[in-house]
C-alpha cells in the first residue's frame, strides 16, 4: 500500500479523469490534464538532475501551476519547499540555504528578487518561471518559461515506485523566529491532515483507494481554500479535494468581495479561512452585498466554512451565524508540528474564555509540566500534545527537535508550545502559544484571549497583544490596535469592553493605534512586529491609577 501523496492523487486521476480538478477565473483543468501537465514537469525536473530527496522550492501565489508543481515534485519523490511570497531577499536567502534547495519554480513577478538571491545560493541550478501577466526580466539567471519546460518533456506516468516514508516538509511561518522545516513522512501527514482519518472520530481510513472510490461514487464537492498555499491548512484542503475527485477553486488574491463573488460564480460548497484576519473583511463585504447588482450574494450552494490556524473570535463567529443561517461553521486547532488536533462547531454566544473550544481525538491530549495528562475540569493549564502520526522533527535543527518532540512515560509526543485547559466534558479550550505569553505580576496572560476580548468592541478592526517592560509587574499587557475606518475609541473604552470578557489582570493597560496590523499572507499574527511598534514611540494612551506605574486594571 503506497500511502504517498502522489499515489493518492493518481488514484483519483484514474477514477475520474474527466472531472474538473482545478479552476480559476476563466480556466479549468481536468484530472486527466492535471496528470499530463504534472508528469511533463516531473520529467523536466528529473532531466535537470533533480533526484529523490532533493528540495524544490515553489514560490507562488494560489495558481493552477503551483498545484501542478507540487504534484510533479511528489511524483519524482523530491521534496517541495513552500516559499512565502512576501519574503524580502534576506528571508528568501535563508529559506533557499536552510532547505538545501536545488530547483525553484516561481511566478515571473518575483524575478527581481530571485535574480538578487541566486548568486548567494549556488545549490539552486534549475529555475522554472510561471508567466503571470508581468514582464519582469528573468534572463539574468537563465530561467526557462514554465510552458516551454512542459512542452519539451514526456507526459507519461513512468516513474519509480514511491514510499510512504518519502519526506514532506512544511516550513513554519517564522512569525516568532526563523522559519523551521517540519519533516513528515507522507503517510503520517496524510493521516492527520489529508483525510487519512475521520476528523470527528479519529478512525483511520484503511484502504488507500477509499477516498478516491467514495469521491467517484458521489458528485464532487467544490472547495475553495482562501489562504495561500504556503500555509499547511490550505495545502491540505487542496489535497483532501484531489484525493477524492473534487474541484478546487484557485485565486491568487484576497478581498472580502472577491470571496463571495467566487462562491457565487463557482457554486462553492466549502470554504477554508484562517481566523479573524480573513473573516472581518469577508463579513463587511457580506453585509454590503454584491456592489455590481446591489443584491445579496447567492450563497445557496455553500454549506460549510472551516477556520483553522488563527484566532477566530466569538464575536466574529456570532456575526457569521447571523448572516449565514443554516451553514456549518467550524474552528479547528492544529499546527505544522501536529497536524489536525481537534474541531469545534460554532454555536451562537458560546465562549468559555480563551480561544476555540474543540473536541479532540484520542491522539491529542493536554499534559502538565511532568508529562501527565491534565484531569478534565481541574482548571489547570497544560501543553497541547499529539502522539501517533507526528513529524520526524525539524530539518537540520536537532536542538529544536529535542525541545518540541519529547518522550514522556515511553510515549513520543509533538509539543509545539500551545497551552490549553481541559473542560469537565473533555473538550479543550485553547489559550495560546506559550512563546508569546505575557508574565504580568506572576500571572501568565495569553495574547489570543485578550485579542478576542478587544475585538468585541465595534470600533476595533484588528488587534495584537504583547508584553512591554514594567518596573512593578515585569511586563505590562499592552495592545496594538487598528480601528475601523472613521472610528475612534479610548483606552478606557477598550478596557471596559475587555473587562466584561476577561479577568482584570489580563486587560491591556497601554495602547498603540496603527493603520494596519501586520500579519502573514495566511493571516497569522506577527508578534515581533507588534513588539517593535511598542518600542518605536510612546503609547497613545496608558492606564495610570495615580501611582505613576500604570498599575494593573483589576476592576
From Swiss-Prot:
Tell me which residues bind ATP. Answer: 172-180, 418, 433, 524
User: Which pathway?
Assistant: Steroid metabolism; cholesterol metabolism
Q: Which reaction does it catalyse?
A: (25S)-3-oxocholest-4-en-26-oate + ATP + CoA = (25S)-3-oxocholest-4-en-26-oyl-CoA + AMP + diphosphate
Q: Which GO terms describe its molecular function?
A: acid-thiol ligase activity; ATP binding
Where composition is biased (Low complexity), the residues are 544-555
InterPro entries noted in UniProt: AMP-bd_C (IPR025110), AMP-bd_C_sf (IPR045851), AMP-binding_CS (IPR020845), AMP-dep_synth/lig_dom (IPR000873), ANL_N_sf (IPR042099), ATP-dep_AMP-bd_enzyme (IPR050237)
List the Gene3D superfamilies hit by this protein, alphabetically: 3.30.300.30, N-terminal domain of ligase-like
Task: Give me the disulphide-bonded residues.
Answer: none
- Which segments carry the region annotation Disordered? 525-555
Matching Pfam families: AMP-binding, AMP-binding_C
Q: Does the keyword Nuclease apply?
A: no
Instruction: Write down the top EC class of this protein.
Output: ligase
List the PROSITE patterns hit by this protein, alphabetically.
AMP_BINDING (PS00455)
Q: A GO biological process this protein is involved in?
A: cholesterol metabolic process
Q: Which SUPFAM superfamilies match?
A: Acetyl-CoA synthetase-like (SSF56801)
Q: Which family does it belong to?
A: Belongs to the ATP-dependent AMP-binding enzyme family.
Role according to the record: Catalyzes the ATP-dependent CoA thioesterification of the sterol 3-oxocholest-4-en-26-oate to yield 3-oxocholest-4-en-26-oyl-CoA. It can also use beta-sitosterol, campesterol and 3beta-hydroxy-5-cholesten-26-oate.
Name the record gives this protein:
3-oxocholest-4-en-26-oate--CoA ligase
Q: From which source organism is this entry?
A: Rhodococcus rhodochrous
